[in-house]
Amino acid sequence: MVGYFTLPMSETLIRDAYFLKQIDEEEPATDSASAATAIATGQKTDAGNIAWLTGDPADGALTTIAETLRSDQGFSIGVVSTVPFSHATPAAFVSHNVNRNNYFEIANEIINTTQPDVVIGGGHPDTYGRFRYLSESDYNALNSGDAGYTFVEWTAGVDGGDALLTAAETIDVTAGEKLFGLFGGEGGNFDFHQASDTPGNPSVTPGSVENPTLTEATNATLSVLNQDPDGFFLSRRLTWMT
């Protein structure tokens, strides 16, 4: 897609994708919501749409690859992101909405309807200072266990990576158990890491102990999803932390 105008993938030759020109002065390129939707569903759509048909019809929800693999093949599914879990890219694989900024609606669908087997991402209200990326009621449901997840969250002074990996070891995905990790720093995202200027001896200093690294979050997710003999699907996103 370029701008707000779409072409069905089935009608667009692969080679043509390299010659498409900007056709909307206000939208020189697609946004991450429609880009992720194209990857997750094989369907091009309007900028800002999360797995939803162009034009925003009432019945426009698009089935994602994660949903198809779960329903047709029995796969377990997970999303890992260094930005808030209800942001466009992770959300496009496990939710549906006409507006990427409807964070509460998107988070509610992920937590209560799609219910991926593993969700790890940013958006914790304590680190952001308010409820922006999920509602207080959904946060409380996660915290109390009512949402059906083993919940690991950003906690001052606690090593988030260790806590996440420890929790993952207790999950039996074949028994329907699920893991949710909610972290974040400034802006709701995981912390930036500081790379050392030491040629020949590379190292990275994490921004905080409370947030897991992407490696830790991924390893925790894989330790859960890999239990499924039918297979698994994982969407993994790295942004704004390196």
What are the roles of these predicted feature ranges?
Residues 87-94, 187-204, 227-231, 235-242:
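Active-site His/acidic residue clusters
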Residues 1-178, 184-186, 190, 207-212:
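N-terminal catalytic scaffold of extracellular/periplasmic and nuclease hydrolases
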Residues 209-230:
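Long hydrophobic segments that form regular secondary structure
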